[in-house]
Amino acid sequence: MISTKELRNKFISYFESKNHSHQPSSSLIPFGDDTLLFTNAGMVQFKDVFLGLEKRDFSRAVTVQKCLRAGGKHNDLDNVGYTARHHTFFEMLGNFSFGDYFKKDAISFAWEFLTKEIKLPVEKLWVTIYATDDEAFDVWHNHIGLPKERIIRIDSNDNFWSMGDTGPCGPCTEIFYDHGEDVAGGLPGTPDEDGDRYIEIWNIVFMQFNRHADGTVTDLPKPSVDTGMGLERIAAVLQDVHSNYDIDLFQALIKKAQEVTNADDINSPSLKVVADHIRSCAFLIADGVLPSNEGRGYVLRRIIRRAIRHGNKLGAKDIFFYKLVAELINQMGEAYPQLIDKRELIEKTLIKEEELFLKTIENGIKIFDTEIVSLKSDIISGEIAFRLYDTYGFPLDLTADMAREKGLKVDEEAFKEQMLKQKQRSKEAGKFNVDYNSIINSQAKSDFRGYSTLIEDAKVLEIYQDGQPVNAIQAGSTAVIVLDRTPFYAESGGQVGDKGVLEGVGVEFIVEDVQKSGEAILHIGKLSKGILNTYDEVTARVNDSVRLATAANHSATHLLHKVLKIILGSHAEQKGSLVDDNKLRFDFTHDKAISRVEIEQIETLVNQQIRANYPVATIETSQEKAKSLGAEALFGEKYGDIVRVISMGDFSIELCGGTHVAYTGDIGLFKIVSESGIASGIRRIEAITANKAIKYTFATENKLAAIKEITKSNDSNLLDKLQSMLEQLKNQEKEIAKLKKDILSGANSDIKESSIDGIKLIIANLEGVDIKTLREKIDDYKSKNDKMVAVLSTINADKVQFVIGVSKSITSLIKAGDIAKEFSGYIDGKGGGRPDMAQGGGNNSTNIDKALSDLENHISINIKK
């Protein structure tokens, strides 16, 4: 029997023998593609190649791609554990042609691999083609020799693939394996096609057309091929089992799950859930995702909590999920070394998340069980589901899972309404970023010269206004300029774009931002004088002070990243950064606030590397060579075959395309100005360098000097002096509070109290108190009187403040808010509140006595009505 490990290696070796370049799996987090939550197919890392936006050094590729389907449109989570072939995480075997071979070779490679390399019986294989794809039929029938009756034409979207509403598209051919007559199910295209007898094992997509916005389709100049074969599916075929969960890899994980949960039934769907979910959770964490309440982090949290619930159901009474990581590494660590490298982070993250959820899961399940007893239908309300989510941390799919086991359903639409209301309550304005790739379709190529120069003579290739190409612009126009060569760095890798100017004869274009679109570098800004035409010659001049300040901050992030790993631990991985000329912002994984001592250690070690004045060296080399040098690749970045390596002595080596100083000493000084948490397990450091750090230090020293002058202290006694002053202030505040209380007690004799129809009426203006004291006095009156109206005011610096209290039992007769509005009219102020409590104030204190007298009459009249 061929193992899953052997099958993975055999696939790669076969296509390498056919001159395919073996490319590593890309991250589960798609780089630069906001349309996808997770990588869900092998072609995702080559999307820009297929679109013509990116070029590679090879025309044939083979990959084993990590894929995840557990969120958004592509979501298999609900079915996992209950079917033979649904998974959250799976591996996709794929071979690709970028304008190289086409249908004949693609089909021939697939057939040879299946029938010669892994020796599947020919008589077990069937194929489908798109209904009108006669070329594919000819290859299958006349070249491969497959009988006509085993080639099925399908006239549906199942055999025609497209990347979207527009763009590359084309027919596909699928290869099916026949499990035999003892398994239910019919051929593709028949009413029984959803059975398990005929299983699709390989899909080969022929990208030969380009679909336009008007719906028309034209031929692509260089047709391409995209194929995919699920590793788990083909392993099940080769190991002669009908369920993916019966293959060697899953059986090892299921047995381990049974061991750590004390489960009785090895065939329990819950064991399959746990075995599946450890793969997706471990790989997501290894790729930089941490549990949170939004986005990818929330999908991870949902999967973890679903696994915990199923483990709880199996009999696990304590944390168990992290115990599967060792077996996962045993099964997949050789193919994916990042599992080994990130083992500590994976296990710690799972332990922390499980401990968090175990605090609420038992109570949540009790609430669920209590609620379903009183149900009058088979529908659990959206309100109940939302309560479980909001109070007990139960994701919707977990509640739906529990409901399905009881033969119930959840009103998901009502749940979504509750979620929408919550989002509206906490809605925050989001930052709007322009996606120039989506509005500017430039085919130009700009040659970036900015690593070695800040000034370059160039030619204007294209001009865009409002996303549309134009031939010329007038002074005052905002536009996007594309040059044939440029020293301007385009925003990338967390570093903002350069600023500067494009100058010509009588022409000046102020560059405010720089972005990329494909291979074009976009200079975004405003023409301040002259007329600029396409093909004009200009001098591109980068603002050197901005560039140098930005470079200092960028180089400092490299030092900071390495120092964080030394001080905090190897888990401190970069999660994001922003570098401009003012500051640097660095986000990283760490599960608690950084102490003042650690801040000092970090600053000290970074500044030691600055003073060491290491040369900042740059080399371009292959990814493999870079890894052998110990270069650190950053999460979320996309790298080509040839990468740029930035080294700072032997201290820091990273892959980076940004701009840097020549020596670490050029950074000058590094100073952290803030440290905070931005999400669960994610911390943020903001820091400054060079002149800004020096100015910040001077400003801080000046403030300290001012404090010493005000407090009449020096360096040796400043802290003691401040502590003494704080103690003195606290004592004085206590004395003031006591004096106010005494004043109020003394004023009680001046407070006018009367009774009208059994309702106590209290009215007074009290001197020397604040509004807080008035509120406390009102609360005291209300606690002692069931039927009472109290109006208390005070005057401070000619400003009137008042508080009105009314017992709740009589608010039908008179309301505090109404009295407040009337009171405000006497004092040129404003006031309002609830029926039982209101307050207000004004600037005119001359009428206070008349106001209180008139209010007494007004209240009496209303009570007697």
Swiss-Prot record:
Q: What is the E.C. number?
A: 6.1.1.7
Quote the subcellular location field of this record. Cytoplasm
Q: Which GO terms describe its molecular function?
A: alanine-tRNA ligase activity; aminoacyl-tRNA deacylase activity; ATP binding; tRNA binding; zinc ion binding
Keyword annotations for this protein, in alphabetical order, are: Aminoacyl-tRNA synthetase, ATP-binding, Cytoplasm, Ligase, Metal-binding, Nucleotide-binding, Protein biosynthesis, RNA-binding, tRNA-binding, Zinc
Q: Name one GO cellular component term.
A: cytosol
Its cofactor is: Zn(2+)
* Cross-referenced InterPro entries: aa-tRNA-synth_II/BPL/LPL (IPR045864), Ala-tRNA-lgiase_IIc (IPR002318), Ala-tRNA-ligase_IIc_anticod-bd (IPR018162), Ala-tRNA-synth_IIc_core (IPR018165), Ala-tRNA-synth_IIc_N (IPR018164), Ala-tRNA_ligase (IPR050058), Ala_tRNA_ligase_euk/bac (IPR023033), DHHA1_dom (IPR003156)
User: Top EC class per UniProt?
Assistant: ligase
Q: Which Pfam families match?
A: DHHA1, tRNA-synt_2c, tRNA_SAD
Output the GO biological process annotations, alphabetical, semicolon-separated: alanyl-tRNA aminoacylation; negative regulation of DNA-templated transcription
Q: Which residues bind Zn(2+)?
A: 554, 558, 656, 660
Under the heading HAMAP family, the entry gives: Ala_tRNA_synth_B
Comment on protein domains: Consists of three domains; the N-terminal catalytic domain, the editing domain and the C-terminal C-Ala domain. The editing domain removes incorrectly charged amino acids, while the C-Ala domain, along with tRNA(Ala), serves as a bridge to cooperatively bring together the editing and aminoacylation centers thus stimulating deacylation of misacylated tRNAs.
Q: What does this protein do?
A: Catalyzes the attachment of alanine to tRNA(Ala) in a two-step reaction: alanine is first activated by ATP to form Ala-AMP and then transferred to the acceptor end of tRNA(Ala). Also edits incorrectly charged Ser-tRNA(Ala) and Gly-tRNA(Ala) via its editing domain.
* NCBIfam families recorded: alaS
Tell me what this protein is called.
Alanine--tRNA ligase
